[in-house]
């Protein structure tokens, strides 16, 4: 009887330990600095830590599962801990559920999968990856022998650039879609830095070459890269010679963590991530005001550069919500309704390419994504 009692006690102890182990696994603490091949987990494993599973050494940045408007869907992000500002997104709009896994497999490939497919991957299988590290700069790196960086998030930016991050020709920033489902892009292209709207025919709406707020340090040089240094956005040639400098803030602190953010509205904002929760953008932005973006106002409404307001042209002010009734054919030119003092000209797109453009018109207001109709305001 005593022997049976002893074994019963052992069994109960083992069961208790097993249950304790299950409880601990469901509340796994975030890793600090690095993880190693053979790692995997879902949002559920770190639900008690807001989805955070990897922190940089000094807890400046975190790699975590993040849910937006839909509490049941997640993206994999790098977030600045103090400001709660997302600075990098792995899977964009390809959302995963709370049971879908992030995997850093034994072959050195890191990927995020949902129930049916892989939605994001570093494509580093068999390249000799020995660890994944999140640095205090916000850079997520896959490291091989002799500390060689085999992959890094800084080389695959999404909508934000950070202090010390080099942005080179061939890279791209991509905004989230706007309310009218328009996406904006930032690139170094044709010896310039440009912003353009993602219509079927891309529309450039800003370039650094034409922005008179920059300081020219060296003329007639080719722009190859850009990076944030203190309170300036610097642009270099291929030899790292400073060509242009764009000072975006009077606040000069070499230790500040600055972010260049491409917003859904198509503007570029500058934020010191150490100041405020959430951090406030600097007053200076690109373009200088919202009227310089592709769709600052609703269709048929004109943005006034004078007071930066959306205004209905007087010729359309009698129409509800400034929306005229149009009988739009499938192709060709549509005549202006009534006698319009501002002379509005509607041009219908045919196969995504405008049939005719009045070059004397001063501004263009696209009517929705991949515009079916473009309204040219001719004053």
Annotate each PLM feature.
Residues 2-379:
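Beta-rich ligand-binding surfaces for carbohydrates and other polyanions
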